[in-house]
Amino acid sequence: MTFRIDAHQHFWQMASRDGYWPPQTLDAIYRDFGPQDLEPLLARSGVQRTVVVQSLPTQEDTRYLLDVASRTSFVAAVVGWVDLKSTDAPADIASLARDPKFRGIRPMLQDLADDDWIDDPVLEPAIDAMLAHDLAFDALVTPRHLPALLAFARRYPRLRIVIDHAAKPPIASGRSEAWHVAMSELAAHPNVHCKLSGLWTEAGPHPDLLRVEPYVRAVCDWFGASRLIWGSDWPVSRLAGHFGDYGAWLAWCEQCCDRFLGPDARARVFGGNACHFYRIDRPSGDQHAQ
């Protein structure tokens, strides 16, 4: 059986979000989502493990996810949140890292007014703590953040960085020249990886798959079979209308990877690379984790 990891999914409880995204107008995702909702989708799609990623900029949300992960066998890793510019960041990171499933940190860069927030030496104590605890960095960015992310990646070449949702390219508008230039520059750095996730959502509620495909081909070309990591972005993926079907997104991505990287890349893109990036123990006999 093929070993698959969904390297990007979310859980949340609306009562604890205090008006934070999603708004009530997004009725497809304006409700609680937990392991009981995702487990049947994983079973039908042949996905064995997941990485749950924060969606609130609070440590309370991170602690909630760690608690859920401790009671959910299919959750292999948690990517949480820490205020990386706080003087308490190193201690907060050390505290969270005591949990064996805490494997990464994601500042919500897309929601910050300062495009260059990440390009700041003030982050150094926090990044040093991440390196000391062998943690990964998830970059939730849009194209406007990519120049600063490039400077950040150059400053910390030992830090494992993954670009969530391929930096949310402007698929709907098609104005992607700046995205192409910046992503190709980032891909030249071996510590930078890319998540094959969220692209149907970025294409709008009724995506034209022929318009999405060139973006998949681009990240396949840039990051190759060893630095591309598949994720569902569930339940946010439900915003893509009937294209938000979990199994349909997985199958389409597998077909694209077969075409652009070759069938032998599947084991890495859909499982092995996530194992390596997030330090997840792989099943015995799976030789494609790196």
Swiss-Prot record:
InterPro entries: Amidohydro-rel, Metal_Hydrolase, Metallo-dep_Lactonases
Any matching Pfam family: Amidohydro_2
EC numbers on record: 3.1.1.120
Catalysed conversion reaction: L-fucono-1,5-lactone + H2O = L-fuconate + H(+); L-fucono-1,4-lactone + H2O = L-fuconate + H(+); D-arabinono-1,4-lactone + H2O = D-arabinonate + H(+); L-xylono-1,4-lactone + H2O = L-xylonate + H(+)
Record-level Gene Ontology MF annotations: hydrolase activity
Family: Belongs to the metallo-dependent hydrolases superfamily.
Note: It was not possible to determine the kinetic constants for the hydrolysis of L-fucono-1,5-lactone because of chemical instability, and thus, a stable mimic (4-deoxy-L-fucono-1,5-lactone) was utilized.
Function: Catalyzes the hydrolysis of L-fucono-1,5-lactone to L-fuconate. Can also hydrolyze L-fucono-1,4-lactone, L-galactono-1,4-lactone D-arabinono-1,4-lactone and L-xylono-1,4-lactone.
Protein name: L-fucono-1,5-lactonase
Species: Burkholderia ambifaria (strain ATCC BAA-244 / DSM 16087 / CCUG 44356 / LMG 19182 / AMMD)
